[in-house]
Amino acid sequence: MPEAIRAVRGMNDILPDESDLWGFFEDTIRTWLAAYGYRNLRTPIVEQTDLFVRSIGEVTDIVEKEMYSFIDQLNGENLTLRPEGTASCVRAVIEHNLLYSGPQRLYYSGPMFRHERPQKGRYRQFHQVGVEALGFVGPDIDAELIIMCARLWRLLGIPDVRLEISTLGSIESRLIYRARLISYLEKFYDELDEDARRRLKTNPLRILDSKNPGMREILEGAPHLFDDLDEDSLIHFDALQRILRNQGISFEINHRLVRGLDYYNRTVFEWVTDKLGAQGTICAGGRYDGLIAQIGGKPAPACGFAMGIERILSLISETDVAAEIHTVPDVYVVHQGDIAAGFSWKVAESLRDAGFKVVLHSGGGSFKAQMKKADASGARFAAIIGDDEAATGQVSIKSLREAVEQVKIDLTKVAVFLENI
């Protein structure tokens, strides 16, 4: 017997029991985003590699080490499985001239791919929901993105998620700060870990996000970006804080908050939990006013966020909400006899027409065995059909969950009967 083929490491199957929770999340997301006027945009999983090099940044970890890239053997194109969704969204907006009709509120969802070391909350194929507001310049849209996240946590029943915010200022102010940060860190070069040394000349702000406990003391003494912020960025950040306070949104200012993607400026934020260990960020985003021009479009402001679905579902699975999410049939149709077997199809389809979830027993078996399967299915009712019932166009309804007397009624009345129990 040949060896069984398994899924690629870090790329997981979503089994039926898990899919119930995914379905609940996806339904909630669609309703939530519609309430804020966001529309769905769907982009290809594969993009030109240069899209991510230009948008994410050539010296980021994602581009240097984590992308799944390959050469198309047919035409020699350098292609990449998308590692994130914002760049693809912006590319589509530019390509199809969507901003010509005004600012856009858009969202996407689907799988992303990064070649990372798999661990809890971090996979090589993972899923994100991303929300993008393109063409909006003020702090009010930054606040909208944050406020809508707070609503989502309530809808999903997720407690104990805290908001951290900061500002990265303008490109000019970051360049000034970058020079000061490098000068400071060079004094501790021998004490820096391998990642920090590599990033020192290429992406020094990412060092601030180090999870290495041995770097903590060095980073605590590092200069603050706030000391170099331009006046417009400070005004923007102050206005954002006022809106959040007025709307009752609690937050912490985290001076070390940076994003792993080069395109961010001004507002950045993360929603964080302590329940997922090192992978505690469940949603992150901010403003990226230069990205549209960077990819080849007419300059326009933009901001957005992305959330990791697997991490959020891990939190939901520990709540009371998860216990109530389980897809089971309303009715399990049991039948005995050749005439009954034929009539059972009509019964099942009639109930489905009325909106009931119905499982029609397949595979034969005794009445006792079928009833056992009906009970195990989780269905509330069994619709029992023998040749006698089939001959008269009737169905026996038995409650599987309550002490209710079994009744025999005409098929034409079954749906109304079940709706009123």
UniProtKB/Swiss-Prot annotation:
It is an enzyme of class 6 (ligase). SUPFAM superfamilies: Class II aaRS ABD-related (SSF52954), Class II aaRS and biotin synthetases (SSF55681). Homodimer. GO terms for biological process: histidyl-tRNA aminoacylation. It is found in: Cytoplasm. The keyword Aminoacyl-tRNA synthetase applies. GO terms for cellular component: cytoplasm. Its EC number is 6.1.1.21. It catalyses: tRNA(His) + L-histidine + ATP = L-histidyl-tRNA(His) + AMP + diphosphate + H(+). The gene is hisS. GO terms for molecular function: ATP binding; histidine-tRNA ligase activity. Keywords: Aminoacyl-tRNA synthetase, ATP-binding, Cytoplasm, Ligase, Nucleotide-binding, Protein biosynthesis. It comes from Nitrosomonas eutropha (strain DSM 101675 / C91 / Nm57). This is Histidine--tRNA ligase. Belongs to the class-II aminoacyl-tRNA synthetase family. It comes from the Bacteria.
